[in-house]
């Protein structure tokens, strides 16, 4: 507790010492500035007294004594601020110039440089000086700046309303008809393994089945046995190019023939298929061959039903 009290006393004492030092420095500086301000005022007052003495001395009388004038200076009110002198003076640190008696105070020329006027103390009375008002200098008008010419507003032309484009009607294309479904029914008549079909016998059996030699140098079975009407199915050589030459059939041999029918065709395709199967069996019996399917395998009842189903599917799809 004592240590805290001692520390507080030391701090308070240090603050008091610093405050005293600051106050002493401030007081000394204030007195010094007051001394310098009083010097020019005393010098101006003495100069003013000499001028008044010269004005008061008139021509001497017969007795050599002039009239004595007593001038009283009206004390300035204490509350009114002292007027600043209107004459130029030298600062206290400038060298003094020899004073010359003048009758009338010469109006000082306005100084170009800005200089702070000393402030007179309020406690010292001072005789009011006549204030001469200088005639206001006519201010020269500033040269008029040429006005910037603003461009004349251009008339805003609104674009003419464009007609809205009329959408051309898109021609609605008719739905494309589905392509008709097609299929080809193929069966073969072939000789037994290692043998050939004789051309002369083959030619006679083909004619007996109602085929007629025609386009593409192959035989065709028409609606009528005499070769008239639309083609129902056709017969070609199993060996490429698949054509025949009726003039040389006597010396002609082949491993087999191919009978094919395109579906859809003319009339009832199922009836045409039955006629085609009968023709193949007749030729096979005449030349001593066998009837094969499109894979050149032995014809079976299952394969025949498959052919018939394919024909029905095409007819229903194209129905």
Curated annotation (Swiss-Prot):
Signal peptide: none annotated. The keyword Cell inner membrane applies. Residues 152-168 have a biased composition (Pro residues). SUPFAM superfamilies: Cell-division protein ZipA, C-terminal domain. Residues 50-65 have a biased composition (Acidic residues). GO terms for biological process: division septum assembly; FtsZ-dependent cytokinesis. It is found in: Cell inner membrane. Keywords: Cell cycle, Cell division, Cell inner membrane, Cell membrane, Membrane, Transmembrane, Transmembrane helix. InterPro entries: Cell_div_ZipA, ZipA_FtsZ-bd_C, ZipA_FtsZ-bd_C_sf. Residues 1-6 are periplasmic. It is a single-pass type I membrane protein. The chain crosses the membrane at residues 7-27. Residues 73-86 have a biased composition (Low complexity). Residues 37-177 are annotated as: Disordered. Essential cell division protein that stabilizes the FtsZ protofilaments by cross-linking them and that serves as a cytoplasmic membrane anchor for the Z ring. Also required for the recruitment to the septal ring of downstream cell division proteins. Interacts with FtsZ via their C-terminal domains. Belongs to the ZipA family. HAMAP family: ZipA. This is Cell division protein ZipA. It comes from Cronobacter sakazakii (strain ATCC BAA-894) (Enterobacter sakazakii).
């Amino acid at each position: 507790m004592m240590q805290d009290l001692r520390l507080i006393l030391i701090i308070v004492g240090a603050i008091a010492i610093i405050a005293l030092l600051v106050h002493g420095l401030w007081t000394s500086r204030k007195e010094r500035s007051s001394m310098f301000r009083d010097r020019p005022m005393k010098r101006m007052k003495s100069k003013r007294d000499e001028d008044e003495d010269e004005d008061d001395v008139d021509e001497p009388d017969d007795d050599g004594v002039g009239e004595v004038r007593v001038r009283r200076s009206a004390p300035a009110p204490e509350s009114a601020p002292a007027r600043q002198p209107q004459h130029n003076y030298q600062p206290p640190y400038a060298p003094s110039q020899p004073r010359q008696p003048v009758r009338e105070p010469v109006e000082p020329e306005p100084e170009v440089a800005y200089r702070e006027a000393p402030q007179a103390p309020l406690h010292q009375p001072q005789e009011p000086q006549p204030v001469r008002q200088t005639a206001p200098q006519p201010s020269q008008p500033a040269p008029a700046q040429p006005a910037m010419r603003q461009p004349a507003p251009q008339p805003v032309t609104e674009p003419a309303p464009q007609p809205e484009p009329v959408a051309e009607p898109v021609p609605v294309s008719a739905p494309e008809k589905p392509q008709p479904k097609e299929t080809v029914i193929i069966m073969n008549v072939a000789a037994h393994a290692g043998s050939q079909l004789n051309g002369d016998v083959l030619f006679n059996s083909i004619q007996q089945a109602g085929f007629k030699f025609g386009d593409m140098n192959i035989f065709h079975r028409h609606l009528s046995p005499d070769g008239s009407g639309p083609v129902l199915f056709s017969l070609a050589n199993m060996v490429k190019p698949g054509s025949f030459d009726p003039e040389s059939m006597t010396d002609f041999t082949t491993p087999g023939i191919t009978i094919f029918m395109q579906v859809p065709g003319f009339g009832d395709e199922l009836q045409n298929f039955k006629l085609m199967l009968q023709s193949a069996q007749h030729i096979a019996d005449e030349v001593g061959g066998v009837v094969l399917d499109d894979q050149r395998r032995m014809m079976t009842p299952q394969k025949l039903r498959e052919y018939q189903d394919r024909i029905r599917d095409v007819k229903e799809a194209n129905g």
